[in-house]
Amino acid sequence: MKLAIFGGTFDPIHAGHLAAAREASTRFALDRVLFIPAAHPPHKAGVTHAPYDDRVRMAELACRDDARFEVSRLEEGTARSYSIDTIEKVRAMLAPGDGLYFLIGADAFAEIRTWRRWTDVARAVRFLVVSRPGHTYEIPAEVTVDRIDSLEIPISSSEIRRTLAAGGIPEGLPPAVLAYARDHHLYN
């Protein structure tokens, strides 16, 4: 089996996240993409806008129509969500020889050298790095990377939050996620 971890705050999840997961699934013949909303990401301490349970539910709604996608609460209740801890938990659930990938945006990948035990992360997974408009990155020699450069989708969760706060209808937000965000008064 080939599985990709796709971690993020998903605050909220949007069409860019889904397009990246679909492209990675197709291009690298992934059996599953495991979306793991971060409970308390160390690089965004105190910055999440929607509560964890709401972010998980929005991810579930966004992923429900693709059998390759699964949403996990693996980081629920953790004090801080470090990638190496998540990778080790996922690896323990896989059979020997299963392929483990890490799907990530170029903006987040650019910070890899600041991650806890980043060289262990680099040894544990193969990175699938999705280009983001305006973001460049260098690839450390210790890291195995496949680039996904064909998807420069100019959608950001922060822009979606601003549009929702202004009462608008943001582009790139799945309809079920938009309905959930409005029904639960998120991002007002």
UniProtKB/Swiss-Prot annotation:
Role, per record: Catalyzes the reversible adenylation of nicotinate mononucleotide (NaMN) to nicotinic acid adenine dinucleotide (NaAD).
Protein's organism: Solibacter usitatus (strain Ellin6076)
Gene Ontology biological-process annotations: NAD biosynthetic process
Coiled coil: none
Gene3D superfamilies tied to this protein: HUPs
GO molecular function: ATP binding; nicotinate-nucleotide adenylyltransferase activity
CDD domains: NMNAT (cd02165)
Catalytic activity: nicotinate beta-D-ribonucleotide + ATP + H(+) = deamido-NAD(+) + diphosphate
Highest taxon in the source lineage: Bacteria
Alphabetized UniProt keyword annotations: ATP-binding, NAD, Nucleotide-binding, Nucleotidyltransferase, Pyridine nucleotide biosynthesis, Transferase
Similarity annotation: Belongs to the NadD family.
Pfam family, one: CTP_transf_like
Upper taxonomic lineage: Bacteria, Pseudomonadati, Acidobacteriota, Terriglobia, Bryobacterales
Protein name: Probable nicotinate-nucleotide adenylyltransferase
Pathway annotation: Cofactor biosynthesis; NAD(+) biosynthesis; deamido-NAD(+) from nicotinate D-ribonucleotide: step 1/1
EC number(s) given by UniProt: 2.7.7.18
PANTHER family: NICOTINATE-NUCLEOTIDE ADENYLYLTRANSFERASE-RELATED, PHOSPHOPANTETHEINE ADENYLYLTRANSFERASE
Cross-referenced InterPro entries: Cyt_trans-like, NadD/NMNAT, Rossmann-like_a/b/a_fold
